[in-house]
Amino acid sequence: KRKKLKYIQYNDFFKNNKKKYDLVIIVDVLHHVGIESSYKILKKLSKISKNIIVKDHFEHGFFSRQLLRFVDFYANYAYDVNIPKKYYDYSSWKKTIKKSRLKEVKIIESFQQHDGLFNFILNKKHHFVSHLKHVKK
């Protein structure tokens, strides 16, 4: 029997939430929290789920960062979302995982998320998906 998936908006997610989940998926969110403090969100998520799937962005230098900022601004302007000054690079992502006390099961780097013009502007090297797992103490 299939279970129905339930979407829970982030603002409400941690309020009085005592449930455990098989999987939590977080898409293009952590860089808005800030790469220096995003490990705190991952730690919270690891308390309610053994598996976390993260989709986010890698920057590859100054020009790459400006492209990411432009696309973020365009996509989030109407929602008053913080546009970060920095995005993850491979090293900062690994540090975030370590600070979160999670284990990376698999990472998929460089995949196409968008079609057409957005793929031309923000090509596949800017995207990654990481499967993180809660490590028992």
Spell out what each predicted region is.
Residues 1-14:
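Class I SAM-dependent methyltransferase SAM/SAH-binding core
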Residues 14, 31, 59:
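Active-site micro-motifs of SAM-dependent methyltransferase domains
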Residues 17-20:
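Glycine-rich phosphate-binding loop signature in dinucleotide/nucleotide-binding domains
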Residues 55-117:
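C-terminal alpha-helical "lid/dimerization" subdomain adjacent to the S-adenosyl-L-methionine
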